[in-house]
Amino acid sequence: GVDLAAVPSLARKQVEILRDGASSQYGSGAIAGVLNFLLRDDDEGFELVTKYGSMHEGDGTNYMVSANVGMPLGDNGFLNITGELRDVEGTVRSIIRDDVAYAVANGYAPVANFQNINTYTNEVPQYWGQPDVEDDIKLFFNSAIELNDTTEVYAFGNHAERTVEGGFFYRNVVGRASNLTPGASTGQRGGVYRGPAVDPLTGLALAANAGGVPSVLVGDMDGGSSCIDGIPLGGQGGITPDPSFLSQVTADANCFSFIETIPAGFVPRFGGDNEDSAVAVGIRGELDYGTGVAYDVSVQRGSNRSDFFIRNTINASLGPATPRDFVPGGQEQTETLYNANFVYTVDAGFASDLNVAFGAEYREEEFDLFAGDAASYALGPLASQGFSSSSNGFGGFPADTSASQDSTAFYIDLEADITDTITMQAAVRNEDFSTFGDTTNYKLAGIVRLTEKLRLRGALSTGFHAPTAGQASITNVTTQIVNGALTDQGTLPLFSALARLSSSMRPASSTLVTPRTTTPTVR
């Protein structure tokens, strides 16, 4: 979605909300309305705002420093600049997980020290709260200068960056109370700790209907069959690893289980370094040969990039050779827009002139995936023995991938006061995408002023939400072990041959009817 946090609040002069569907005017995504930000255009003055606070529990400390300055640009222009710096400490609102409390109560010592589980806080073994936001820097500018009485050149843009980090769920080692119920889910992390049901006397897997006890998964490093299949769990509460089998696995260099190296389990920490940049340049004014036509022609380019990281996790298929921190890659969306908009009025015999707005837009989109480090997507030697591949929690992208699409749109919008009490609007927009074809959307809206204090409003509109270049065209395939066989899994292009076999895919569409009554706001 749109990241409104990239625009500092001091850069905003006013926010307008169009609550009716607006795909017929603004295109994809404007199904339920539009937010229009009017930027500050002061050519003088300085404003400084600082904020500091924290939560009652003592965490969540945050500060913000923001400043805005306006200055003249020549004799008939302005340059307005806003900067903001913010830091937000994460919060933790977790309680002790039932499975961890159960393990502690039943004598599984490794989880008693919560710092062994959660590297972020030693208070609870599960991170739950708002993420950390560090080095949140935002810069924004807005400018314009008059060339003559009817023409103005303008430009605005921004650069924002920040690092965000949060936590995932706890990876359970030995299970919970359900261990005592045959056939029930143990709650152990699959692909890391959860082993097959095993014979408690041999540690070897039993058939699904042959009983057995839960176990902790064991891998055979040379791919042979010299190791047991799992360390049986039993004892008090059904969560105690059998000490003799655990010693046997530990003593054999060819056998490996993550209970040896990470006996308390773990909580991955996931985040990203985000950058958002955009610039728009345009010219607006009135045509000077008596037509009364106002115009606005512009070009805009923007990009958003995220480079991900994940730490305090593993690639289980690599066994003891796994790193604990990974760089799984990144992604970037880049868009370029060319707009031409025109407005004029004509006398059509109504109570007011008929306002005619029309225009065209050409959009280019590009989406790029950047490959992660090799360990973040590797299929290690233990993958065929039930250990999951890729960095646990967020697997890395295996290769650089790019996708693109473009679209061309035309629209017309008519509005007039038909009588002194009735206002009507009609709009239609056609947009043609290189990836899936064209779509036409319309809007009919009106206002009836019943009294000075009561108005009846209504709108009938159609809308759509087109897939982005990344959603429509990206390929990201990883290899996993499913039921003992190597299987490719991932995301395929929306219009690939395989996707076409599954269903006929079109952009999401809508029909919106919005009747309402309104009264003037009392100020």
Residue ranges and their predicted role:
Residues G33, E44, Y63-A67, D135-F141, ...:
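Hydrophobic, lipid-facing positions within transmembrane beta-strands of outer-membrane proteins
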Residues S9-R12, R40, G74-N76, E146-T150, ...:
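Outer-membrane beta-barrel channels and translocator barrels
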Residues P268, G272-N274, V279, D288, ...:
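Outer-membrane beta-barrel transmembrane domain signature of Gram-negative proteins
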Residues E57-A264, P268-E286:
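Transmembrane beta-barrel wall of Gram-negative outer-membrane proteins
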Residues D41, Y52-H56, L85-E89, H159-T163, ...:
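Transmembrane beta-strands of outer-membrane beta-barrel pores
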Residues S303-D307, N312, E364-L369, D373, ...:
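Surface-exposed extracellular loop regions of Gram-negative outer-membrane beta-barrel proteins
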Residues Y52-M55, V124-G129, G265-R269, A321-G330, ...:
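Extracellular loop and loop/strand-boundary signature of outer-membrane beta-barrel proteins
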Residues V2-A5, R12, I17, G29-T50, ...:
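N-terminal periplasmic accessory domains that precede
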